[in-house]
Amino acid sequence: GKTREEIAFLILGRASTPAEQKGDPIDAMLRIIGTRKREIIQRSCGDLIEFLDPSYGLDAVGGYDQIKQELMKIAATIKTGDRRLAPMGLLAVGPMGVGKTFVIKAFLKEAGLPGVVLKNFRSKWVGSTESNLERVLKIIRAMSPIALVIDEGDRSLGSGEGGDTDGGTSSRVIARIKDFMSDTDNRGHVLTILMTNRPDKLDVDIKRPGRLDRK
């Protein structure tokens, strides 16, 4: 049989770019596998999700000292692997342009969590929105541990907008996401991070503890 290094060399020599071959061969092999896995997932999901690949931690964030301290504590808790102590979700609130996404990406780096942004899962075709959402949620569960990031939550998860004009799709989507966020089987596996600049427009029930534990 071949050693791990020999297997890594064979993989690196046949299925990688020069950038992927840098550093330790085992680490490089794992990077290649991770990259290929993401490519397959993105192809299967179309433009429904986007991966976050932060290259910096919270030390790159200027100011926000109190917020950074709290996020460092949460990151440390997540890294212990104790599911009982992990929060179900985080709510990031602030006006546009204050750096919410930058801070969240830095937090994910500190916590060692990959992140996926929920994107255009809504569709003009009847039934497609809900099937799109189910497909994304199944993939996210399969990729755990992971962070599910929902940007502009006031738009996608607003308090019932569209319920009377889209056949109830909006209400069913919000209900499904609330169920997912409060599913205790996800604790320590899927961390939901909801970002918004208008928390007053969010469905009230979404903001309760057990879905978004930290604000």
Regions found by a protein language model. Name each.
Residues 27-29, 57-60:
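A diffuse structural propensity rather than consistent per-protein peaks
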Residues 58-215:
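Walker A/P-loop NTP-binding motif of AAA+ ATPase domains
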Residues 1-50:
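Interdomain "pre-motor" coupling segment immediately N-terminal to P-loop NTPase/helicase cores
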Residues 53-54:
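AAA+ P-loop ATPase central domain
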